[in-house]
């Protein structure tokens, strides 16, 4: 558990840590995940600190979903995919946030319950190169502007 003074996402929302922002509103910001599942993987993060998604006030939850819905067609266009996935985890950082992921493969977002062979070893996704993040952010912002 963390508080807003040390929370990574709170610090990003306050502008203390740089990010590749693609959209923002009074309640939330959207920026690229630096360890993306796929290029264009966006995090939608409330500006206010909430440890769990079920703690979100209704207006904040609505805004997070509104931004995710706004991003989906922009990601389909800018990343050249047919489907965009949306999920909440709250596993790595104790600050409620949504993942909006351009899906290249149906298994880009899955559950271990569907895995036929075990054991599996999981580790963090590799850091995306800064240039790739900059290019993706520019493409997504462009697609948002064209919407």
Cite the ranges covered by each PLM segment.
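HIT superfamily nucleotide-processing domains
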Residues: 1-147
């Amino acid at each position: 558990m963390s508080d807003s003074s040390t929370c990574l996402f709170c610090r990003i929302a306050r502008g203390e840590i740089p990010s590749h922002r693609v959209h923002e509103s009074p309640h939330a910001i959207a920026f690229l995940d630096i360890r993306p599942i796929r290029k264009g993987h966006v995090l939608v993060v409330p500006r206010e600190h909430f440890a769990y998604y079920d703690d979100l006030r209704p207006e904040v939850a609505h805004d997070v979903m509104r931004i995710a819905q706004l991003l989906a067609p922009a990601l389909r266009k800018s990343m050249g995919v047919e489907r965009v996935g949306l999920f909440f985890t709250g596993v790595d950082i104790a600050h409620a946030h949504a993942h909006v992921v351009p899906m290249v493969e149906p298994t880009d977002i899955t559950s271990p319950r569907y895995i036929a062979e075990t054991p599996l070893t999981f580790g963090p996704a590799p850091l995306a190169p800064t240039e790739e993040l900059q290019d993706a952010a520019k493409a997504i912002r462009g697609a948002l502007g064209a919407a």
